[in-house]
């Protein structure tokens, strides 16, 4: 699907998002204070989140699984780069074969080795000597790192390939968002369709949690968008972010949304302040657009990797 939506957020929009995350956390906290532990919705969801259908461990040793997963992530990173570049340029993902974007010469196999080829070629094309975009090794390294961390976190379970696929979708969406402030509908609309059966059958989540997460995630961001537009007369964020939160809500459930939103808001605000200090602009800083998709993706990955531990710590903190 080629149709796209803007994915930008302003400083005022970031503040609104952080306030919304704080309110969501307050609501969860109040629920714990009013209910016995055995009746808490978080306590019930905690058990469901850990129900994974595992592959027999004898088939794959952990000490081999993590390096293999990291290598797989590096290889997938090359494909993610193709998706990002060709989406932005409007080319087909399948044809033509991999080539230099400057001289259009087809790349040989030794020029396609993740990260290593970039280092051996010293960051430039072997024929025309034009620079290779730094995005290529960074995306490959990021993909390898996230794949290795997922393998370490989940091991050889059904959760690993599920989260690997969706992490790859988030990497591609973030790369596109950083380049042109757009989140593709193929990911933001196709993702929820895939996330529903994945969450229910592979991750052991109740279908009510998956649907409720999507409704709360997308609905909350849509409400912020509409209220901000009504009060300020401008868009505080792009509609692509609303659709991305729909996907993340389905995949992570309603209890993952406060952490995702908080991490995204705080990290985006920190990036905004850093950019404001390093790159002075003539336009008002509060109107400076920031691609929000990468920060939502970061929040989702933090939840996937350590959300249960953070949730357990938060429960102990608020219940004494």
Predicted regions and their residues:
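Interfacial loop-to-transmembrane junctions
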Residues: 239-240, 280-299
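Functional transmembrane core segments of multi-pass inner-membrane proteins
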Residues: 69, 159-273, 312-320
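Extreme N-terminal basic, low-complexity initiation segments
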Residues: 1-19
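N-terminal cysteine/histidine-rich coordination modules
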Residues: 55-92, 107-108
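Alpha-helical membrane-inserting segments
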Residues: 80, 84, 146, 150, ...
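Membrane-proximal soluble regions of multi-pass membrane proteins
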Residues: 83-135
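Short terminal hydrophobic/aromatic SLiMs and anchors at protein ends
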Residues: 6-10, 22-28, 36-41, 47
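Short, strongly hydrophobic alpha-helical membrane anchors
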Residues: 48-62, 316-320
């Amino acid at each position: 699907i080629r149709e796209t939506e803007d994915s930008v957020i302003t400083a005022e929009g970031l503040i609104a998002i952080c306030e919304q995350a704080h309110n969501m956390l307050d609501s969860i906290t109040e629920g714990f204070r009013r209910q016995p532990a055995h009746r808490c919705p978080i306590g019930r969801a905690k058990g469901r989140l850990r129900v994974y259908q595992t592959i027999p461990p004898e088939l794959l040793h952990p000490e081999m699984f993590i390096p293999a997963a990291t290598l797989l992530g590096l290889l997938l990173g090359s494909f993610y780069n193709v998706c990002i570049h060709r989406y932005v340029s409007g080319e087909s993902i399948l044809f033509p074969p991999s080539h230099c974007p400057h001289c259009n010469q087809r790349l040989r196999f030794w020029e396609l080795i993740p990260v290593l080829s970039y280092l051996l070629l010293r960051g430039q094309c072997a024929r025309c000597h034009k620079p290779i975009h730094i995005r290529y090794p960074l995306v490959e390294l990021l993909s390898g790192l996230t794949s290795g961390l997922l393998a370490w976190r989940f091991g050889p379970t059904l959760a690993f390939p599920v989260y690997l696929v969706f992490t790859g979708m988030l990497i591609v969406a973030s790369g596109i968002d950083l380049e042109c402030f757009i989140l593709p509908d193929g990911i933001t609309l196709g993702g929820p369709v895939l996330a529903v059966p994945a969450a229910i059958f592979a991750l052991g989540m109740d279908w009510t949690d998956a649907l409720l997460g999507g409704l709360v995630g997308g609905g909350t961001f849509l409400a912020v968008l509409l209220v901000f537009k009504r009060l300020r007369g401008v868009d505080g964020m792009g509609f692509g972010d609303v659709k991305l939160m729909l996907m993340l809500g389905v995949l992570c459930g309603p209890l993952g949304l406060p952490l995702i939103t908080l991490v995204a808001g705080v990290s985006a605000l920190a990036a905004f302040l850093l950019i404001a200090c390093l790159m002075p602009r003539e336009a008002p800083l509060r109107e400076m657009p920031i691609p929000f998709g990468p920060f939502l993706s970061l929040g989702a990955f933090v939840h996937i990797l350590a959300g249960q531990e953070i949730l357990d710590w938060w429960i102990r903190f608020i219940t004494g």
